[in-house]
């Protein structure tokens, strides 16, 4: 966040509208806060969610509720459950998300 100045603020997620994103199977619901150089999202993947694309973007991801499988293009997989996080840089480890039971994530990345 070098050079980005963000004054103290709170986020009341109940006041942030949700957008719906259809994927290969299931739906992703996003609540997004966009700041200069920073995107903060509360993301809910429905039961049976399978991302329709491989993502090359870097993120900080924290699992608030549920379980998600993060599949990397090299075939490896990492499972996040409530209270776990992962971090990844842009263009370093192409990945996608899959969940059978549904999950709620807090995702922070660049714009």
Q: Predicted regions: what is each one?
A:
Residues 32, 40-44, 60, 77, ...:
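Conserved hydrophobic/aromatic beta-strand scaffold that supports enzyme active sites
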Residues 74-91:
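Short acidic-glycine-tyrosine-enriched beta hairpin
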Residues 90-111:
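Ligand-binding loop in jelly-roll beta-barrel domains
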Residues 1-42:
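A short, N-terminal "cap"/entry segment at the start of jelly-roll beta-barrel domains
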Residues 50-55, 71-72, 97-98:
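Short histidine-centered beta-strand/loop micro-motifs
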Residues 36-55, 89-92:
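Conserved short histidine dyad/triad with adjacent acidic residue
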């Amino acid at each position: 966040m070098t050079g980005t100045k963000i004054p103290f603020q709170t986020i009341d997620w109940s006041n942030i509208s949700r957008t719906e994103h259809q994927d290969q199977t299931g739906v992703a619901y996003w609540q997004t806060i966009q700041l200069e150089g920073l995107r903060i999202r509360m993301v809910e993947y429905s039961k049976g969610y399978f991302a329709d694309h491989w993502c090359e973007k870097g993120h900080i991801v924290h699992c608030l509720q549920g379980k998600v499988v993060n599949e990397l293009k090299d075939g490896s997989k990492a499972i996040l459950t409530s209270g776990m996080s992962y971090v990844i840089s842009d263009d370093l480890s192409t990945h996608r998300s899959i969940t059978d039971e549904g999950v709620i994530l807090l995702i922070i990345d660049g714009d």
